[in-house]
Amino acid sequence: MLDRPVSKRFSLLVLPIALSIFGVAQPTFAQVLVPHVPQLDPARLEEQGLSLAQESAQLAQFQQYELALVRAQLATQLVPENPQVWALLGSLYLQVGQDQAAIAPLQKAQSLDREEPAILFALGTAYFRLKQYDQSIDALRTGLRLKPDEPGALFDLGNAYYMQKRYGDAIASYQKAVEISDEFWPAINNIGLVLYEQGDVDGAVEQWRAAIAIDGTQTEPQLALAVALHAQGDQEEALTTGEAALRLDNRYGDLDFLVENLWGDRLLAQTRTFLQLPRIRETLSQLRQPQPQPEQ
């Protein structure tokens, strides 16, 4: 899993912090244009820049990211020495998938405030998405030295290790995340992914069952469990579990989607076989049919 409700992927830790910094309790959307200033008054410019940043944070809270980006970009011009404003801009780029564009503002934010772990965690996210895993690991480990008890960052670090096939380090990082938050099912799920790639099918099954026990509404551990059970010869439970999983979210019937969620080669090979089973193919066919529109 990559980006789960908490980020199999990523938990964008910087954006919530930016929102809290600028305050979003009473959202009011003023005009975006910066008032004309006859004389450059530094205090006035700073006030305007922070106001724009606050508006940007408010818009981001309502997922209006493109509008938020415009304001954040203007804010960095008016208050170029404010690390929170740069962090906000970088986090917004991440939210809209402009991962390369996020690097420069996050680096600027980090140069202005080297003690804020959320900036480093966001940098780790950006580097991971760009497949720059060494840089991702460096940023995440530096952030964790400042805030070692952040399960989302430990999870992201585990993902980066996993992509480098540093399986022991990946499991250790996931386990630390679970020690801090024992119901953090994405980390438990990903321990299963690693164990499966190492050939420990029984261990993977145990992890996926544990993840399901925490949150039975999640598709990924259920489908992974179904695939593993099928490989072990437990056909009926495999089919029942797999059908139930796909009914929760049929995107998991797409191998490309599974690759995005960090499923490894061994599990993908078994999943390809599983998805070709007649009952599973029929289930997916039904789920992918257009739903009839209610009569007016």
Can you say where each PLM-predicted feature lies in the sequence?
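Terminal, low-structured helical/coil segments at or just beyond the last alpha-helical repeat
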Residues: 31-43, 244-296
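Alpha-helical segment of the N-proximal tetratricopeptide repeat
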Residues: 45-84, 88-98, 125, 129, ...
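TPR/TPR-like (Sel1-like) alpha-helical repeat modules
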Residues: 209, 213, 219, 223-254, ...
